Amino acid sequence: QAFKGFENLSNPWGLASNTRGDWFKELGVQTPEENPDFEYLFYVGCAGSFDDRYKKVTIAFTKLLQKAGVNFVCLGDDEMCCGETARRLGNEYLAQHMINFNLEMFDTIGVKKIITACPHCFNTLKNEYPQFGKGFEVIHHTEMIRELTRKGAFKGGKKFSGKGPLVYHDSCYLGRYNDLYETPRDIAR
């Protein structure tokens, strides 16, 4: 069932691919056609596009990028799954189809830097796409937030007081696979 969703709709949930970009329609996010001189592609991923809980992360991060004046675009309905799940489930043919499709699209629109909030997409884009002949600077959203915070992009915002619990989940794909442990902690300090 999941493979059929990937093959026909480019997502494991089997949701209509023409709704992939619905989350950003009211936010004024541009596509590469509208902003061909973008600096960053915000690659949202399947969960960030379709899962209602994860969309909250996508929307909040988008608003931070906009507040900081970052020149970015999203692919919206044209985004295809990065291929991570198909590859992990053993469907290498389907994964390579998705990877090659994305690489062609990235090349066509001139992608050089990719930001993503999804740890699975981050690991795949950063460590597996270069095996297919093309690599990019891939940045996890916590790295971008840390950098923008250091530059003072969010002055006037609320700061964590240090009182009470602050919970952060160290994703396997960020921590163990990419050694990104301190980045989110730096943001909270």
Ranges and model annotations:
Residues 150-189:
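Redox cofactor-anchoring modules in respiratory/redox and cofactor-processing assemblies
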Residues 132-162:
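Short, flexible loop segments at boundaries between secondary-structure elements
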Residues 44, 140-142, 170:
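Short, structured patches in soluble enzyme cores that scaffold and shape functional sites
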Residues 1-117, 122-129, 133, 148:
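Iron-sulfur-cluster electron-transfer modules
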Residues 56, 97, 139, 143, ...:
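Conserved active-site and cofactor/substrate-binding residues in soluble primary-metabolism enzymes
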Residues 121-123, 144-147, 172-176:
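Short, catalytically relevant binding-site loops at active-site mouths
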